[in-house]
């Protein structure tokens, strides 16, 4: 029995499902989840000392690769001064200044401890600012596990076949209007009917929780126009895309400016961090300036600020995102070529340093229906074949993949060699 199998068996005694986040249980791909003990650069090492090229990157934060020495040094320096103060620090002021300089739409920002906190707080703020109750989200878009957002939520919810979580009161869900992603006409029609009741539209500008679905041409622009017309707050959930698809996030990449944005993952450099912010007139409604309450014991934690600040400064160097995107493109092109050569229906998607893999004969992946029509069973087999070849992909057909600046020619060779064998075995 492997060390991972032993640990997983033991874990299930006191941890529900043996994991602390559902997708880690490998339920959607089968088999025993890997337990990792070390990570460095583009690699993770499991408890049985097998090394894998990592395309999960802790679900997105590790854009520099694992254990970047500058980030570790920054955390060690702060460690000597304490773990948490529950009081303001110079580091959080530096972080706020840096984020607002990188993302032009951010005039003010509030730090929190997770992406879920960020989206939950942004929606509360939008409701308080507008005096309206309803929100619009999109099928297959996941914005954390707060009650009003676990409706057709994609990602882990899709993985486990429970798109609407039990435990969410109907009274909460009734204020959440769910529309098809990339369907701007559905948005216009809905706002035309109930626009005066809608506080905000929240959207992943790249839907990273039904694998990776970029916006259709004109979709984000249409959302901006529709929100302006009906006095609705536009929220971009950039927990995945922020600082990854471009330094200024998806809003810079696609040239569409939201009213509020939420961030997580990269902003913490691997530590638990989230943030939300945007227009000053809206953010001034947050306590202690305004009546909309939000608070957090560990918000702005100094260790997390040290890791996040260092990460953001390192990814600010000229050419960083071009290099990240170029590697991702080379990797996806190589996968597509090998799938085509093997006669396997296969489609890839990309937004900067994030990507999607679909076993599908579709010309493109644009809608939730396109995603659901992909061959999930074939993905399961592919996942395990790649794992055998030393490549760790997200253990779900509905999760995006991530590259890091630490991925290079050697990792590309390992990945494509494993893929060539995997596609051949899938014939």
From Swiss-Prot:
<dbReference type="GO" id="GO:0030170">
    <property type="term" value="F:pyridoxal phosphate binding"/>
</dbReference>
<dbReference type="GO" id="GO:0042286">
    <property type="term" value="F:glutamate-1-semialdehyde 2,1-aminomutase activity"/>
</dbReference>
<keyword id="KW-0413">Isomerase</keyword>
<dbReference type="InterPro" id="IPR015421">
    <property type="entry name" value="PyrdxlP-dep_Trfase_major"/>
</dbReference>
<dbReference type="InterPro" id="IPR049704">
    <property type="entry name" value="Aminotrans_3_PPA_site"/>
</dbReference>
<dbReference type="GO" id="GO:0005737">
    <property type="term" value="C:cytoplasm"/>
</dbReference>
<feature type="modified residue" description="N6-(pyridoxal phosphate)lysine">
    <location>
        <position position="265"/>
    </location>
</feature>
<dbReference type="GO" id="GO:0006782">
    <property type="term" value="P:protoporphyrinogen IX biosynthetic process"/>
</dbReference>
<comment type="subunit">
    <text>Homodimer.</text>
</comment>
<dbReference type="InterPro" id="IPR005814">
    <property type="entry name" value="Aminotrans_3"/>
</dbReference>
<keyword id="KW-0663">Pyridoxal phosphate</keyword>
<keyword id="KW-0963">Cytoplasm</keyword>
<dbReference type="InterPro" id="IPR015424">
    <property type="entry name" value="PyrdxlP-dep_Trfase"/>
</dbReference>
<dbReference type="GO" id="GO:0008483">
    <property type="term" value="F:transaminase activity"/>
</dbReference>
<dbReference type="InterPro" id="IPR004639">
    <property type="entry name" value="4pyrrol_synth_GluAld_NH2Trfase"/>
</dbReference>
<comment type="pathway">
    <text>Porphyrin-containing compound metabolism; protoporphyrin-IX biosynthesis; 5-aminolevulinate from L-glutamyl-tRNA(Glu): step 2/2.</text>
</comment>
<protein>
    <recommendedName>
        <fullName>Glutamate-1-semialdehyde 2,1-aminomutase</fullName>
        <ecNumber>5.4.3.8</ecNumber>
    </recommendedName>
</protein>
<dbReference type="Pfam" id="PF00202">
    <property type="entry name" value="Aminotran_3"/>
</dbReference>
<dbReference type="InterPro" id="IPR015422">
    <property type="entry name" value="PyrdxlP-dep_Trfase_small"/>
</dbReference>
<comment type="similarity">
    <text>Belongs to the class-III pyridoxal-phosphate-dependent aminotransferase family. HemL subfamily.</text>
</comment>
<keyword id="KW-0627">Porphyrin biosynthesis</keyword>
